[in-house]
Swiss-Prot record:
It comes from Saccharomyces cerevisiae (strain ATCC 204508 / S288c) (Baker's yeast). It comes from the Eukaryota. The gene is PET20. It is found in: Mitochondrion. Residues 44-93 are annotated as: Disordered. This is Protein PET20, mitochondrial. Required for respiratory growth, stability of the mitochondrial genome and for proper assembly or maintenance of mitochondrial proteins.
Length: 253
């Protein structure tokens, strides 16, 4: 038999030995103090803070002798100027006060919005409140002035006919929508013809003509009645002459 140089160690026992060796050799080191528990660091920090405070106090108390003499005078002048300023301000406010009690009081308009007001003005038919001067189209030198531009806007705003909308331009009537614009432009309001003043000769002629027409009508009616009586002669007790006379009197009256 051959002799082994090293004794045979099974794998399980080998792993156990390695792990035990690691446990024995590995140690966890932790610091036993912090900044607050270290007295040397705290004392150094306190010394630094004391030096800073001392330097600030020295700079605050270090003033030249001239400044020391003039300091109270400056303060006094400052107080005087403040008082004078307050007096002047108070007198100014007193002068500005005025009595507005005689003016009529109106309800607040805080509930109205600017956007709603501008839209109402835009859709109500009025001219715009302002023209933007920064518009590049207006800045161009076209030879026309702002007045001419406003007149053109006014011409565009005018309706085709006066009866297509109300007098204020707030309401448009729908019955005129289907009528063409060319016909609307040619429409004119109706004016009754003037009565002609007649002369005396013309009046006499008209009255005579009217009388002749009346006489012709009466003669025609009498003739018609006489023809009727002549046809039914001998019928009835009333005489035809009496009825004709009565009829003539009634027509003439």
């Amino acid at each position: 038999m051959l002799k082994l140089a090293r004794p045979f160690i099974p794998p399980l026992s080998r792993n156990n030995a390695i792990s035990s060796g690691i446990v024995l050799t590995s140690r966890r080191f932790q610091s036993s103090f912090t900044f607050l528990s270290n007295q040397s660091l705290l004392s150094k920090n306190q010394m630094k803070s004391k030096r800073k405070k001392g330097s600030k106090k020295a700079a605050y108390h270090r003033q030249p002798p001239e400044h020391e003499h003039t300091a109270p005078l400056i303060k006094q002048n400052k107080t005087i100027t403040k008082k004078e300023h307050s007096d002047v301000r108070g007198s100014h406010l007193k002068k500005k006060r005025s009595d507005f009690s005689w003016l009529p009081r109106v309800p607040s308009t805080s509930h109205l919005k600017q956007s709603d007001m501008t839209t109402n003005v835009l859709y109500s038919g009025y001219r715009p409140l302002f023209i933007n001067p920064n518009d590049p189209k207006l800045k161009e030198d076209t030879g026309s002035t702002l007045y001419e531009f406003a007149m053109k806007l006014e011409d565009l705003n005018e309706p085709l006919s006066p009866w297509i909308s109300s007098a204020t331009g707030l309401e448009f009537f729908s019955e005129w929508e289907n009528i063409p614009s060319e016909l609307l432009k040619n429409l004119k309001p109706f004016h009754p013809p003037k009565e002609k003043s007649m002369n005396t000769n013309e009046l006499i002629h008209v009255s005579a003509k009217r009388n002749t027409l009346v006489d012709n009508k009466t003669s025609e009616t009498l003739q018609r009645k006489m023809d009727e009586f002549s046809k039914r002669r001998g019928k009835g007790r009333k005489k035809s002459v009496v009825t004709l006379l009565q009829m003539k009197k009634k027509l003439e009256g």
